[in-house]
Amino acid sequence: DGLSGDIWFFTIYLCICLRENATSPFFSSHPWAIWVLAVTAGIFHAKQAATADYYRQFHLYFLKGEEGSELDSSVVLRKKYDEMPWRGHFWSKLVLFFYSNYTANQEALSPAMQKLRAELQRVFKGGTASKAFRAEFRKGSLPLMKYTNILSFNWRSIALFVSILCKMPWLYFIFELVVLNGILVYMISRHEALCRRLTKELKAGKFQA
């Protein structure tokens, strides 16, 4: 869903740039400006959406288990990609290529979370985490879910529609760079701190039963 959303918003960004260069006196005189703004916002958009989606899936993993979550591993996905032949699987392999890179980007933005996943694998031997751990993680993660919602589709759409109604679509890029990036930094800081604490407690022998 996150990867599809990136493609969807790419078309929106493109349309905003074309519209502003055609109708705005400032951007008509400086056509490069809107493109620089759009590319910068787009880069951060991808990071915001990917991180929000990843945190949400990790939360669902401890709430509903594997069946209720789409939590993946780039290592596993890359192995599937390497083992899948191009012949007869062209589109599936192409999608897997982009999705494995998308997942790798999510993992790169959450180093403490990756250490926590590795420690969970070690402590619980690849099985289900203890009830005590799952409860403790959900307790710390739940307050952050409101930020994942803000960084998702609905709030972006509202900001986009407001900027269009104000006849200043470029304001959406400013909203993304200033407001959403601020939320992203805060959310990552909180989530990584949670993961570091739980990793330390797991190593100390807590949540074993």
Regions found by a protein language model. Name each.
Residues 1-49, 160, 165:
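Multi-pass membrane catalytic core of lipid/isoprenoid biosynthesis enzymes
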Residues 44-45, 54-209:
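C-terminal membrane-associated helical module and adjoining short loops/tails
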